[in-house]
């Protein structure tokens, strides 16, 4: 009962917020960032918030955890200052900001938050100031003084030339006829403004930044007697066109316009939703080689993939980007959208030339470079962007590169450049065949490969797939990087050249003079049939040198005992195919003899039972061969090791028994006696 009461007390404590109130709904991202800023500023007194200012600019941000430690925003260094949190002010002689700001009407509150220019323009109209000072409940997104001063002169002149129509309408568009706080500003919502019920777009991002028509909230939730004031960094204007309509009227989108029409994506860009279009200008298309561009424009599927790669699934305003973030496109790819100073970047490159062109269904950023996805590229183009350029050069020398630029459904198993660090192989008929065996006759995806699968190549070979815990291999070569899936082909980056099998394990051993003594031993033991038939074996093949290193009397004794010879040879044969790329730190491989082999790899050196392997991955149709310069001994043939194991087992038994009785504890003291008896058994 006492335990139950403690649990109930804990549950009640967790469900109750500050001052005994029930815990409320989850805080919005903005409120969470503000809370973090409060925590960082509390050492300076009550209601103090830490603020990060970007050095060399007037930009300030409430600090989140990541920015606090990095001290950077958009790659620029920041300095920390401490200010009164929204709604509070200092009191002379007291620490922090202990006093709540006295409530005034909307008009007066705009002056408090630093929007005196908005006050000035409000005074110029006949109707607006009385509304702001009178009864009612309103929200105003008040532009900062800097926002007004940054307006183009012709825009400002048109507003002030007709204050009771143009200026009044512009100011009313910044107002909503009810109180709206940041916790109500949901991502992707629209608010109805007081100018002809025109919509205002709201975006509330996970990093705590809130935008209104892509203008950032600088100071939020300043209460007034008749509403609330949010200070924003831009003067906002009405949005009338959708994305497709903007494409239609912009001269710089002539090529994009034609491409969208040909792809049928115009229905998407004029429909409902909130998208970001990274809109390539005419100049962006002109940078692409004519052959490549014509190929894509003439291929409906590639064209659609190209355009989908320029459409983000959500609206992303420039002011919301303070660091790199991955964003998904309509095509399912991801782009890294970031910033460097005042410039927006895509995949680390500053390609955005004009930003935040607002549409009713999203936002447009002009880009001066085409973002071609892998799915619209040929295999040759994919390879040109990967660390396999040497393999491509070899293909070109062999006259085989046309396979990678056409419409053949292929998967190219391309060795890394590092594979050729010792030189490029000579191009002859045999090398051409080997290169063709690096081209699989279908477009694959590595995530669908499975162990035991066979792949047909242009060179006429069947390649086997081996799946291990931490690697995926095709014959002796393992995939070293993520697939690149192109329009018709897929690029697999491989860690070595393939060596397709040329015969059975027995064929391999017979064809290599190093193994002549092993072949004779296999024949003597009657194991030829096993190594000639279909199967999956890993053979650690002792070389002639290994047999010659044995004491003559021991070797003669072994060869004279057919049963013992068979036992030892079977211990050298694993019951599955294990290529070196699948080994990892340690693999215990069961042998045909029954005991397990310990195979390990460290610093590119493969060992079996701690003995280094002389040569790895000699592929056969029914297995793989490793050359070793030692004859391995099964555990039963290692008396010292066997005795140690028995001794360890005896000690363990007595240790376990000691946990249960005093008699068992006395038995543990007898363990050294048993140890000595076992030592005698070994001799």
From Swiss-Prot:
Domain EMI: from-to ranges: 45-99
Function: Plays a role in cell adhesion. May play a role in cell-collagen interactions.
Cystine pairings recorded for this chain: 49-85, 74-339, 84-97, 214-317, 473-478
Protein name as it appears in the record: Transforming growth factor-beta-induced protein ig-h3
Keywords per UniProt: Cell adhesion, Disulfide bond, Extracellular matrix, Gamma-carboxyglutamic acid, Phosphoprotein, Repeat, Secreted, Signal
Placement of sequence motif Cell attachment site: 642-644
Residues recorded as bearing Phosphoserine in the entry: 37
Ranges for domain FAS1: 103-236, 240-371, 375-498, 502-632
Any one GO CC term of the record: collagen-containing extracellular matrix
Pfam families for the chain: Fasciclin (PF02469)
Sequence positions bearing S-cysteinyl cysteine: 65
PTM annotation: Gamma-carboxylation is controversial. Gamma-carboxyglutamated; gamma-carboxyglutamate residues are formed by vitamin K dependent carboxylation; this may be required for calcium binding. According to a more recent report, does not contain vitamin K-dependent gamma-carboxyglutamate residues.
Subunit composition and interactions: Binds to type I, II, and IV collagens.
GO biological process: angiogenesis; cell adhesion; chondrocyte differentiation; extracellular matrix organization
Cell compartments where the protein resides: Secreted; Secreted, Extracellular space, Extracellular matrix
Signal sequence coordinates: 1-23
A single GO molecular function term of this UniProt record: identical protein binding
Tissue: Expressed in heart, kidney, liver, skeletal muscle, testis, thyroid and uterus.
This protein's record includes keyword Disulfide bond: yes
InterPro entries in alphabetical order: Adhesion/Biosynth-related, EMI_domain, FAS1_dom_sf, FAS1_domain, TGFBI/POSTN
């Amino acid at each position: 009962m006492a335990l139950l009461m403690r649990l109930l007390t804990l549950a009640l404590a967790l469900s109750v917020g500050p001052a005994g109130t029930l815990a409320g709904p989850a805080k919005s991202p903005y409120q969470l960032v503000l809370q973090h800023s409060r925590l960082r500023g509390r050492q300076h007194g009550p209601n103090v918030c830490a603020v990060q200012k970007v050095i060399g600019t007037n930009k300030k941000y409430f600090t989140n955890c990541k920015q606090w430690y990095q001290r950077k925003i958009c790659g620029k260094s920041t300095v920390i200052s401490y200010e009164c949190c929204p709604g509070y002010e200092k009191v002379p002689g007291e620490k922090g900001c202990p006093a709540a700001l006295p409530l005034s009407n909307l008009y007066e509150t705009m002056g408090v938050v630093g929007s005196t220019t908005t006050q000035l323009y409000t005074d110029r109209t006949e109707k607006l100031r009385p509304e702001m000072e009178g009864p009612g409940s309103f929200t105003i997104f008040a532009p900062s003084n800097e926002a007004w001063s940054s307006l183009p002169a012709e825009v400002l002149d048109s507003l002030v030339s007709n204050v009771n129509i143009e200026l009044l309408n512009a100011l009313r568009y910044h107002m909503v006829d009810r109180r709206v706080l940041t916790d109500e500003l949901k991502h992707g919502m629209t608010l109805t403004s007081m100018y002809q019920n025109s919509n205002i777009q709201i975006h509330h991002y996970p990093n705590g930044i809130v935008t209104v028509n892509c203008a950032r909230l600088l100071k939020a939730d300043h209460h007034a007697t008749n509403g609330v004031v949010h200070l924003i960094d831009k003067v906002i204007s009405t949005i009338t066109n959708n994305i497709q309509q903007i494409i239609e009227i912009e001269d710089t989108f002539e090529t994009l316009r034609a491409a969208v029409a040909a792809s049928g994506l115009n229905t998407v860009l004029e429909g409902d939703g909130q998208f970001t279009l990274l809109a390539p200008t005419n100049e962006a298309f002109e940078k692409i080689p004519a052959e490549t561009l014509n190929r894509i424009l003439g291929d409906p599927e590639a064209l659609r993939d190209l355009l989908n790669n320029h459409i983000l699934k959500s609206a992303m305003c420039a002011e919301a980007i303070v660091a790199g973030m991955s964003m998904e496109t309509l095509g399912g790819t991801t782009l890294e959208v970031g910033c460097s100073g005042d410039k927006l970047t895509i995949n680390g490159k500053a390609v955005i030339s004009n930003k935040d062109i607002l549409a009713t269904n999203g936002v447009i950023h002009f880009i001066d470079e085409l973002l071609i996805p892998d799915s619209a590229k040929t295999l040759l183009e994919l390879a040109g962007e990967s660390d396999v350029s040497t393999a491509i050069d070899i293909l070109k020398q062999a006259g085989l590169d046309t396979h990678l630029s056409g419409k053949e459904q292929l998967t190219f198993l391309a060795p890394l450049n590092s594979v050729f660090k010792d030189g490029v192989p000579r191009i002859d008929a045999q090398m051409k065949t080997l290169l063709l065996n690096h081209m699989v006759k279908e477009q694959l995806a590595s995530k669908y490969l499975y162990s035991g699968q066979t792949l047909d190549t242009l060179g006429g070979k069947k390649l086997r797939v081996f799946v291990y815990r931490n690697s995926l291999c095709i014959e002796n070569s393992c995939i070293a990087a993520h697939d690149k899936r192109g329009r018709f082909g897929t690029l697999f980056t491989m860690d070595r050249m393939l060596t397709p099998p040329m015969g059975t394990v027995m064929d391999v051993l017979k064809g290599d003079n190093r193994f002549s003594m092993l072949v004779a031993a296999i024949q003597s033991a009657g194991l030829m049939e096993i190594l000639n038939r279909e199967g999956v074996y890993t053979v650690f093949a002792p070389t002639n040198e290994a047999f010659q290193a044995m004491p003559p009397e021991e070797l003669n004794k072994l060869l004279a005992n057919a049963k013992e010879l068979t036992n030892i040879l079977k211990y050298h044969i694993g019951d599955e195919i294990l290529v070196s790329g699948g080994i990892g730190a340690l693999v215990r491989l069961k042998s045909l003899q029954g005991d397990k082999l310990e195979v390990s790899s460290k610093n590119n050196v493969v060992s079996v039972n701690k003995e280094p392997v002389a040569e790895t991955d000699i592929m056969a149709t029914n297995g793989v061969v490793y050359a070793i310069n030692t004859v391995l001994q099964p555990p039963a043939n290692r008396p010292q090791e066997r005795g140690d194991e028995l001794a360890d087992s005896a000690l363990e038994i007595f240790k376990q028994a000691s946990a249960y009785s005093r008699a068992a504890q006395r038995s543990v003291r007898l363990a050294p006696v048993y140890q000595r008896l076992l030592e005698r058994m070994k001799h």
